[in-house]
A protein has these predicted regions:
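Conserved blade-register residue in beta-propeller folds
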Residues: 52, 190-194, 215
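A short acidic Gly-Thr/Ser loop motif
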Residues: 33, 41-49, 110, 164-165, ...
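Short glycine-aspartate micro-motif
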Residues: 36-42, 102-106, 157-159, 179-183, ...
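Glycine-rich phosphate-binding loop and adjoining helix at the ATP-binding site
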Residues: 66-86, 90, 113-180, 198-220, ...
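A polyampholytic, Gly/Pro-enriched intrinsically disordered region
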Residues: 177-184, 202-204, 227, 231, ...
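Generic beta-strand/beta-sheet core signal
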Residues: 108, 161, 193, 365-367, ...
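Short, glycine-/Ser/Thr-/acidic-enriched flexible segments
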Residues: 187, 197, 221, 264, ...
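ATP-binding/phosphotransfer module of carbohydrate and carboxylate kinases, centering on a glycine-rich
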Residues: 1-103, 149, 174, 231-417
Length: 417
């Protein structure tokens, strides 16, 4: 991981690097002195949120509203999409009694982007069911600005924010030693504060502040064979049935999108080999993606002596488990989730060693981390193994894509003033 990080940061090797290490253009963490009224726009799926975030001496007050994007808007023209967003921004501002006030806005845009400045990023490709025309390759901040002009919406878009960077910013407002942000949800990614002098790909100015947050895009790690010694036959089977075959291999061993499928494949093999369920594979158990990652969380959260939750889930999948089957299935879930936590920490330890800090807080967000009963404790134990002597606190970061984006706008306002 450390070698991959260095390749991503070096301008000579960045083009072919697997872990891209994109500079976010966010140069400074909050110091708690940020004050004022800010807006945030969080667009990452078929619902988007508009938020008003009021910062008052370390205290944060938020109001927000969720808007649904119709499928014809997701798949129509870019102008239609951004005009609709501008209309919603206008409506929200009026509801907040700020119709004519020009306020700074932080824009979280959770699609693959090439960032060219703090408030400039080109869409690389649409994902998650979006296909609005005339947007790929264009600056999405510029498109939103133009829509705001067309719709007469007074807003100053000061930053485009990656959700991982937002996770770090959200936490750093209250923790001055937060230097790493981590997402452990459907996908996984990390970011951290790097010295500008270590960023060979930096194209901005080299004045103060002399740091920049790096968006690692670390889920891509492993496609050069770096993880081959750790990948099992089940990991390879999962990779075979995904649309991005051979890519995001680290993510496929860690994140919530894939853990349930890994467990299902193990169950099918053990059943076929005659070790589970009397050797009978049910049609549901034989169906890809039918064993959901939330089942791991439910099974491992069950503290009863009879593994009742496990029995309920397996019965719903059409198999009849024995008492020993239940214990085996639980053990498999634990093995898969523990491996995921340990692999995530292996990546973190490379970042922590590179930074050389003796004490730090890691801001973490994502459904896997939030909902799984032992993910956090497994991570903490592994951190003590891999980076002994460093004092590390894992802190749940609340609402990185909303509050975090507003804080990026607030820090930009503080620095420019």
């Amino acid at each position: 991981m450390r070698q991959n990080m260095d390749r991503g940061l070096d301008s000579a090797t960045h083009q072919s690097a697997i872990v891209k290490m994109f500079p976010s253009f966010v140069r400074s963490l909050p110091d708690g002195s940020e004050k004022g009224d800010f807006f945030a726009l969080d667009l990452g799926g078929s619902n988007f949120r508009v938020l008003r975030v009021q910062l008052l001496e370390g205290d944060v007050q938020m109001t927000s509203k969720v808007y649904k994007i119709a499928e014809e808007t997701m798949t129509g023209t870019g102008d239609q999409l951004f005009d609709y967003i501008a209309d919603c921004l206008s409506e929200f501002k009026k509801e907040e009694g700020l119709g004519d006030v020009d306020l700074p806005l932080g824009f979280t845009f959770s699609f693959p982007c090439k960032q060219n400045g703090l408030a400039s990023a080109e869409l690389v490709q649409w994902t998650k069911g979006f296909s609005a025309s005339g947007v790929v390759g264009k600056d999405v901040v510029q498109l939103l600005k133009e829509a705001c002009v067309r719709k007469n919406v007074n807003l100053h878009i000061v930053a485009l924010v990656n959700d991982t960077v937002g996770t770090l910013m959200s936490c750093a407002y209250s923790r001055s030693d937060a230097y790493i942000g981590l997402i452990l949800g459907t996908g996984t990614n990390a970011c951290y504060l790097e010295k500008l002098s270590n960023v060979g790909t930096w194209t901005g100015d080299s004045g103060e502040p002399t740091n920049v947050i790096i968006n690692m895009e670390w889920g891509a790690f492993g496609s050069d064979g770096a993880l081959d010694n750790f990948r099992t036959e089940f990991d390879k089977q999962v990779d075979e049935v995904t649309p991005n075959k051979g890519k995001q291999l680290y993510e496929k061993m860690i994140s919530g999108m894939y853990l349930g499928e890994i467990v299902r494949l193990i169950l099918v093999k053990l059943t076929t080999d005659g070790h589970l369920f009397g050797g009978k594979v049910s049609p549901d158990l034989n169906t890809p993606w039918k064993f959901e990652t939330r089942f791991l969380t439910d099974i491992e959260s069950d503290t009863s002596s009879d593994n009742g939750e496990c029995r309920t889930i397996l019965t719903s999948l059409g198999v009849t488990p024995s008492v020993s089957d239940l214990a085996t299935v639980r053990r498999i879930c634990e093995a898969v989730s523990t491996r995921a936590a340990r692999l995530a920490v292996a990546g973190l330890s490379a970042v922590i060693r590179k930074m050389g800090a003796g004490e730090l807080t890691i801001a973490v967000d994502g459904s896997l981390y939030k909902k799984h009963p032992t993910f956090k404790s497994n991570m903490e134990a592994t951190l003590q193994e891999l980076v002994p002597g460093v004092t590390i606190k894992l802190m749940l970061s609340e609402d990185g894509s909303g509050k975090g984006a507003a804080l990026v706008a607030a820090v930009a306002a503080r620095i420019s003033s």
